[in-house]
Design a protein with these regions (language model features):
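C-terminal subregions of glycosyltransferases and related glycan-biosynthesis enzymes
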Residues: 208-336
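Nucleotide-sugar donor-binding/catalytic module of glycosyltransferases
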Residues: 1-223, 227, 335
Length: 336
């Protein structure tokens, strides 16, 4: 009998301690009806391979695939998609941790919302091995997601669950994307009209660490993000210049020097984009502006002149009650 959920995880060089916590958080889920497809993308590391083989020997739900060579995350995930036999597919990363009822709550969400194709969840962070409730709020409703996915990916990738029928219909990760393969896939799905949603509560602990992203890798991520955003805008008949694209991905540039001047240029660009998006009946301008404000506030927190940058944010738009609440929440989150 086929499992209800196929969990897919790719393993490369994650520390065994992190890997153990991640695997255990799946195996001890309150929802038991799943298969766990683990793709080892580091076949030359006998320690990792043997570690995973031990787990496979003690839990029949684990299906272990050892790639013949290092194939990269995108291809490894597509291997997992081909093997998935469950009604739903859940993503998981090898260094993150699921909360006990993650699978149960996402299955219930998709069962109760048959119009939704892809479901994510909110997240807590693990920073230097400590849980931190950092500022991160994802939109829950499809209309809000459609209105804001140009600015950022709508999901935390390892929190996502989606319907396996999508794979049978031909959906998979684009292997031309070394990074941001999830954002590229969600963008194509959204543009095709598929509906998305997020469970409001955090159901995973998402691990980050100082120095986690090298400048070299970040440069690759930025180029992938530029291609994705350019394709989104092209589908909306908007031609964007290379300099504008570089500005649009400024919030994700880890080594960027953020000045008030650059923040203002970013604000002008997204304001102009908002005017263009007003012509798109699927875009809710209030949701778009709220996400712009969140992004501006995050840029302000990195600014070389925080006071002048923050004052600019206050005058960026006529602030609604919701926007004022957003600013207040942001300030509190940085203090607590």
């Amino acid at each position: 009998m086929e499992a209800v959920v196929s969990v897919i995880m790719s393993v490369f060089k994650e520390p065994q301690e992190y890997l153990k916590h991640s695997i255990d958080s799946i195996l001890t889920q309150s929802f038991k009806d799943f298969e766990f497809i683990i793709i080892c993308d580091n076949p030359s590391d006998n320690n990792i391979c043997n570690f995973l083989k031990v787990y496979k020997s003690i839990d029949y739900r684990i299906k272990l695939v050892i790639n013949p060579t290092n194939m990269g995350l995108t291809k490894s995930l597509n291997i997992g998609l081909k093997l998935a036999s469950g009604k739903y597919i859940a993503r998981m990363d090898a260094d993150d941790i699921c909360m006990h009822e993650r699978l149960y709550k996402q299955v219930a969400y998709l069962e109760n919302n048959p119009e939704i194709s892809v479901c994510g969840t909110n997240r807590y962070y693990i920073v230097n091995d400590k849980v931190v409730k950092k500022y991160n709020i994802l939109f829950e409703k499809n209309g809000d997601i459609v209105s804001t996915f140009l600015l950022r990916s709508p999901f935390t990738h390892p929190s996502v669950m989606f319907r396996t029928i999508l794979v049978k219909e031909g959906w998979k990760y684009n292997e031309n994307f070394e990074c941001a393969q999830d954002y590229e896939l969600w963008s194509r799905m959204i543009l095709s009209g598929l509906k998305m949603g997020n469970v409001s509560e955090p159901l995973i602990y998402y691990r980050v660490s100082s120095g986690q992203i090298s400048c070299k890798k970040n440069a690759i991520q930025l180029e992938c993000a530029k291609r994705i955003k350019k394709n989104i805008l092209k589908s909306w008949n908007y031609s964007i210049s290379d300099s504008e694209l570089s500005l649009l991905v400024l919030p994700y540039q880890v080594d960027a020097i953020i000045t008030t001047s650059r923040i203002k240029k970013f604000g002008t660009l997204v304001s102009n984009l908002g005017i263009v998006l007003d012509k798109n009946e699927l875009i809710d301008r209030d949701s778009f502006d709220l996400e712009v404000l969140r992004t501006l506030m995050l840029l302000c927190s990195r600014s070389t002149s925080r006071i002048s940058s923050f004052l600019y944010c206050l005058t960026y738009k006529k602030l609604s009650y919701n926007n004022l609440k957003e600013i207040f929440r942001f300030i509190i989150s940085r203090i607590v």
